[in-house]
């Protein structure tokens, strides 16, 4: 059997900060990492047409308040609360603003909606319904038809319309949509707007003029935006563990982070990404350093073309700072170690050429069952294919070589973070 240079008897798991896989697959809700949902901002409330009531005066000065703005739809990251997108419903609508009232009382704004998502979520706008916003009038109660115009009043009506449009444009200028794609990192905990609510209508006090001292009309509020958006989770982690099914990635993650990933002797035990956190102490200054480690579902030949689970989950390693290829070097492995490495290398290269530049370490797992020759064959093909990528033998099952592995991953990651 192969003797591990960095072998240790038993090591305690590194301090566990959080693993998104704390529950087993059997107890977790359905995993969703790509969904489409409809979002809609609330409509603005109507402006009010009213007057101050005074004795012997049918219409005092106008005092109609504005309608409240409709609520908007926001998105924000909530670290540690979600590990996928299954908690989001298909439709999210903000509340409408309430109507204005007499006495210059403005309507209240509608309640906004915040969509909380895990870090690593990308949001794309698929389509948007932006109806042409026109100025619609609201008459005083009991006056369903526009008042008949007398001679000389046409100029006033056109002036009021122009003034109303200017005011609404000024109030609605913030409704100009932003970027069509958002990429949310762990630091994006401040809500970002996705869909604006409509601004409230104008009360009749805005239409007081020399030509009309008793304006008996107000305006309706504008409608809120409507959008169809797509949310895609691309897991954020510093290091991604990539390997064929049954290479021992889940066992490795469990040992290093005290995660609770499911382990089995059949293919595709892991059916969605699991994340654990390694916390270690640097030997030079004894400072604390932590990073996230992701167990990516097993990749098979043709994964870059959509076969198996690979196509859906290869995107989860796109944002990783560094990749570690986990190779089973057990002589009884279904695919020999050298062929397994070449297969993984080819699939990563086909999916996105930049991914192979992230490969910094090859972990030769199950080294306690392998001979020296098996490790030498793997090292030979790695040296021919890569530029300076090291091969480190470990045994996750027996927890041998893990201390050296953590030390090596930490050093390599720090080097990449400094670039």
UniProtKB/Swiss-Prot annotation:
Q: Which PROSITE patterns match?
A: G_OBG, GTP1_OBG, OBG
Give the originating organism.
Schizosaccharomyces pombe (strain 972 / ATCC 24843) (Fission yeast)
Q: What are the protein's UniProt keywords?
A: GTP-binding, Mitochondrion, Nucleotide-binding, Transit peptide
Q: Which family does it belong to?
A: Belongs to the TRAFAC class OBG-HflX-like GTPase superfamily. OBG GTPase family.
Q: What GO MF terms are annotated? A: GTP binding; GTPase activity; magnesium ion binding; ribosome binding
**Pfam assignment, any one:** GTP1_OBG
Enumerate the InterPro entries for this protein: G_OBG, GTP-bd, GTP-bd_Obg/CgtA, GTP1-OBG_CS, GTP1_OBG_dom, GTP1_OBG_dom_sf, OBG_GTPase, P-loop_NTPase
Question: Do you know which CDD domains this protein is assigned to?
Answer: Obg (cd01898)
Q: Would you say which domain of life the source belongs to?
A: Eukaryota
Q: What is this protein identified as?
A: Uncharacterized GTP-binding protein P8A3.11c, mitochondrial
Keyword field contains Ribosomal protein: no
All copies of domain OBG-type G, residue ranges: 237-414
Q: Which residues bind GTP?
A: 243-250, 295-299, 364-367
Name the Gene3D superfamilies for this protein: GTP1/OBG domain, P-loop containing nucleotide triphosphate hydrolases
Q: Which residues form the signal peptide?
A: none
Source organism phylogeny: Eukaryota, Fungi, Dikarya, Ascomycota, Taphrinomycotina
Indicate where this protein resides in the cell. Mitochondrion
| One example of a Gene Ontology biological process annotation | mitochondrial large ribosomal subunit assembly
Q: Where is the Obg domain?
A: 29-236
GO cellular component, alphabetical, reads: mitochondrial matrix; mitochondrion
